[in-house]
């Protein structure tokens, strides 16, 4: 199923393309929860879920940080949802023209995105795509196990975008090392996320950890 044209049209027709692209990127984290046999059924499922709430003040802080950022690192998660990530990255580039590096797993765990999937959807045609350098399967990102290249990019970045629960579970423990310049995009899939973020199960989570922007915490 070719999802991209459907998603692209949703963004193009939106009153706020970035807001819609962010929501779609988070909804991509719920592909494993969706049941759709046809493109029309998938489109209807996505449109229904686009009504899910996403706090405007949190989104506004994210947008403000994007405006001030020249270098971004985007940690991808699962293979299927990187089509959604590509759409968000394209939207960010069109609006703010930052330098973006998309990081995939060197070794997949189950359905993790790798260079193969990123190249298949053409991610490498719009941004630089690199592996995280972790030797062995790990459903997340531990910076001490990542390559020197990834760590150097993280240090020099103005903003890190972390996609999915696996990346949140690992990177959240490294906030101080990340200098509080990270935004987590994920779906509230379980009780621990509900307790941590105060976001109902199956709802959208955008959590910002910024050093210099006020009023930007999710919880």
Label each region the model flagged.
Residues 1-71, 82:
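Electropositive, gly/pro-rich neighborhoods at or near active sites that engage anionic ligands
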Residues 71-73, 158-159:
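Structural motif
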């Amino acid at each position: 199923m070719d999802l991209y044209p459907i998603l692209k049209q949703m963004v193009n027709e939106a009153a706020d393309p970035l807001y819609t692209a962010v929501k779609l990127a988070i909804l991509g984290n719920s592909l494993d929860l969706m049941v759709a046999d046809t493109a029309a059924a998938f489109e209807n499922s996505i449109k229904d879920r686009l009504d899910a709430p996403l706090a405007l003040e949190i989104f506004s802080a994210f947008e403000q940080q994007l405006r001030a950022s020249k270098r971004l690192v985007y940690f991808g998660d699962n293979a299927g949802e990187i089509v959604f990530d590509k759409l968000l990255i394209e939207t960010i580039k069109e609006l703010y023209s930052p330098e973006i590096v998309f990081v995939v797993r060197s070794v997949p765990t189950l359905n993790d995105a790798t260079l193969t999937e990123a190249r298949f959807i053409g991610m490498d045609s719009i941004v630089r795509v690199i592996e995280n350098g972790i030797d062995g399967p790990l459903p997340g990102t531990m910076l001490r196990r990542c390559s020197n290249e990834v760590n150097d990019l993280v240090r020099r970045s103005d903003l890190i975008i972390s996609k999915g629960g696996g990346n949140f579970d690992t990177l959240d423990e490294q906030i101080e090392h990340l200098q509080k310049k990270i935004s987590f995009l994920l779906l509230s899939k379980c009780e621990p996320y509900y307790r941590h973020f105060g976001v109902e199960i199956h709802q959208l989570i955008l959590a910002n950890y910024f050093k210099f922007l006020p009023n930007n915490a999710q919880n």
